[in-house]
Amino acid sequence: MKEMKRSRIKEPLNSTTKNIDLVKKNPETWRIIPGSIGQYTYMLDGTKLSGVFNGHGLPPDAAYDLVSYKHGNDVIVLGMGVVNARGDLRITNDPIDVGPAHEWTGDYTGQPAGYKIWLVPVANIENGKLAWHPNSFLFEKSLAR
């Protein structure tokens, strides 16, 4: 009897689902402060990022972009949503190429490269450029990898 070879399905790199908490931070100290919160549940397949963001305690009817912050004032918009009357927000994004991971300094010095994920008001983004108003942003607690 002829032995059959088993074919293996190639799994995407980093194909497991992971979570990143997004929080308010003091822009002078970068310490976490009380306020709105969120969580991004994501998958990273090479440089393609997909996932679901759920936020709470946000201003009702406010429009937000979920972004991958690159450098300077460059961002890639992952998705957009409007906060409901209870202050909750859900944004889902299909796989988007976010380019190569970046090696960050500050809190991330010496750590493997990754992606910063932020929630920012839609009014703060124009043509992929970010207007810096950090008091209205939610910032990542850890990098997407």
Regions found by a protein language model. Give the residues of each.
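N-terminal targeting/export leaders
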Residues: 1-145
